[in-house]
Regions:
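Short, well-ordered alpha-helix to beta-strand connector turns
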Residues: 7, 43, 94-95
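N-terminal accessory regions of nucleic-acid-interacting proteins
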Residues: 17-46, 50
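Mixed-charge, glycine-rich, non-catalytic linkers/tails in nucleic-acid processing enzymes
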Residues: 170-233
Length: 233
């Protein structure tokens, strides 16, 4: 068994443990966020998702930031912590891969909260486009197709700004990052084997440049798959 395959098996055992315990920690203070940031800066990768409210076409307010580091799921209350004060720089670290699904709006939401540009991203929707030609598959659909697991969609249109959040909202938010790492491990291996990982990385840099450039109008219909489509995958 190769070293990379053995490492993947270790991570997947951790996934099974996390899934069995079904736990999450709620972070609602700068002190807790600072401690968590120190922990997450030591991780090779974390799964990330956001809940937000769009206030206008080009503006949004981040309401919740969900993180899975394989040991635990963290729900960071960005309404109560409205100014992170550089306490979440793991999001901007080159050494920590941030795993998203359909990351365009997540990138915008994090930027609206921090004013900083995330780096070293992986997008499971984009990876699926390069691997199987599925250009806009949703998170629930991908989890069902690849893992045979049904993910709850009941709180998709909830009011994420109102506090306190309900137990149903919290459980839904946690489930949005529960399976991302498992998808990432399989997809990254497949992208490397098919020599497509560079395409994925280049596409994400292209997408980020569109979002953060002040001279480019953000197209709300953009899925971040322009180059993938050009390659006719």
């Amino acid at each position: 068994q190769s070293r990379s395959s053995a490492a993947s098996d270790v991570y997947k055992r951790q996934i099974l443990i996390l899934r069995t315990e079904e736990m999450f920690t709620y972070i609602d203070s700068l002190e807790d966020l600072e401690f968590l940031n120190q922990e997450l800066n030591q991780k090779p990768f974390v799964a990330v998702d956001t809940e937000f409210r769009r206030t206008t076409k080009d503006n949004m307010r981040l309401a919740l930031l969900q993180i899975n580091d394989l040991e635990e799921i963290y729900l960071i209350d960005t309404v109560l912590i409205d100014n992170p004060e550089n306490k979440c720089d793991f999001l901007f670290s080159d050494s920590v891969t941030k795993i998203f699904h359909s990351c365009k709006e997540d990138i915008e939401a994090v930027y609206s909260w921090t004013g900083e540009v995330m780096v070293n991203l992986f997008d499971t929707q984009l990876a699926e486009a390069f691997l199987d030609g599925h250009y806009s598959i949703g998170y629930q659909g991908l989890v069902k197709e690849k893992l045979g697991i049904t993910v709850d969609k009941g709180e998709t249109r909830s009011n994420w700004i109102r506090r306190p959040l309900t137990d149903s909202q919290l459980n839904y938010a946690a489930s949005d990052v529960e399976f991302l790492i498992e998808l990432f491990l399989d997809q990254k291996k497949a992208l490397i084997e098919s020599n497509k990982l560079k395409w994925h990385d280049e596409e994400l840099k292209f997408l980020s440049s569109r979002i953060y450039s002040p001279n480019i109008q953000i197209d709300e219909t953009c899925k971040g798959l322009t180059k993938a489509e050009e390659k006719n995958l």
